[in-house]
Amino acid sequence: ENILKELKTINFTGIVADICSVKAPLLIAAQGLNYVGTHPMAGSNEAGFNSANKDLFIDAPWAISVVNETNKDALAAVINIVCELGGFIVPVDPHDHDESVVLSSHLAHVVASAYAKSVGESEFAQLAQLLAGGSFRDLTRVTTSPAERTAEIVWPNRKSLSRVVENLGENLAKLQNLL
């Protein structure tokens, strides 16, 4: 958001696009700029230059937040870049995007963290990890992401995430009652 403010102060007229995981606040901050909000649904639990993957975006869904004010030329240019990178476009309202990524991405980070913590606190943690197979690896993969990056991803959407975590807790309580 700070960068968008700076671009406004210098009357920047070029295209501004982002790849952030939350759209609605940026859309407000970018008013008056040739802004196209994007979010490639591709990533890795790894970080740093050595983790780069030239095929990361191939066949990846790429959310593009379009509103009436979106400059059509800027939109076309961004769509062209996404297609060149191998992604496929998913047009989406910014609010709908933010609510959907809570379910498809942000919740997974929180659940994986809670699951890993529960396993780690068990007296059987060491043996459980030794016996862990694909299910454990699949569920905990994102916990190896840098904590700072995970916080940056989920924090801007914390209100929606909190609501979804509450719903998950209710569902877990129902399952617990069935046991």
Give the residues covered by each predicted segment.
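Residue-level detector of flexible, active-site-proximal loop/helix-junction positions
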Residues: 23, 42-45, 69, 96, ...
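Structural motif
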Residues: 1, 19, 65-68
